[in-house]
Amino acid sequence: MKNSKNFSVRKIALGASSTLLATLIAANGMGLANAAETHHHSEHQQTISPNSQKLAKKAQSKMAINNNNYMDQNFDLRKRCFALVGAAEDTHLNYHDNYGSFSGDIGDPRGITAGITGFTTETGDMKPMLDYYHQISPGNPLDQDRDHLKHVSESDLKAHWKDAYDNDTDNFIKAQNHQVKSDDMDVAVKYAKKDHLSQLGQYIYFDALVKHGPGKSNSNNPEDWSFGDLRSRAKAKAKTPAQGGDESTYLNNFVGQRYDSIGKENADNPDMDSDGTFDRLKFQQEELAKEDWDLKLPLDFHMNGKHFILTQDMINGFSDKDLASLN
């Protein structure tokens, strides 16, 4: 739900070495495995020690990452991530409609909430988005609101938001994407690559950034935690794959930190839908338990109490144009 963004800082047939190569496939995709197989055939056959899997994990931190795991280069993954976040934020898979969503004032300290990832009037992400929107579309319907967002009436902002979405759609989507790329997508890609995460891990990071915001508060209060706090606390308990750790163990720790953060916020806000806000985390834990590292479709899940099935046909039907400006 659009209620937790924290901007306190800002907001196998593989030959004799099959065990090793299977591990490399799981960690890095077929490209790395093929490279390892080529190298193997250029050497004499050798016996794999009982510690081969452990050695493969250590080698993983020194080898090239699989760029197919990240939204900056894998467009289909980008569409899957936006659909899943859309289900969590707006209970709607088709992200095109979510650019026009308007949740309003939901009773938290963030003011009025609207847009693809829940821009808010009090946290600092709606204003720069509207400033960029003004740059690319001066005189747009929201120009009259951008300099006094903390005092604008909800009804006026809602009407102007709808006008922008209905009548200046391409520019309005481009402006929202500009902010999402800066605050969420680029940060998710950066740290997912740094930690050598899978496609599933990339999605988990992106969802956390949308929900909790970028930056780091260094607060002991879980309610104040941003993405940087969640990641540092998870790393304190488990090594990332780049450090030679197990991805499932690390990401389960990361999701566990999110449970603590969201749970504390729900406890302090009795009107919050606790079950609904935890659905996104339950889904992530289910995919981790399945070891669905490539986030394969179809995906069958519940979000905000609603049942969804996300298929490849649906992804193919969702707009490519909407997400192109994130390149």
What are these regions (language model features)?
Residues 27, 31, 127-130:
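Generic secondary-structure boundary signal with a strong preference for alpha-helix termini
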Residues 1-16, 31-34, 40-46:
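Bacterial Sec-dependent N-terminal signal peptides
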Residues 20-28:
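Hydrophobic core
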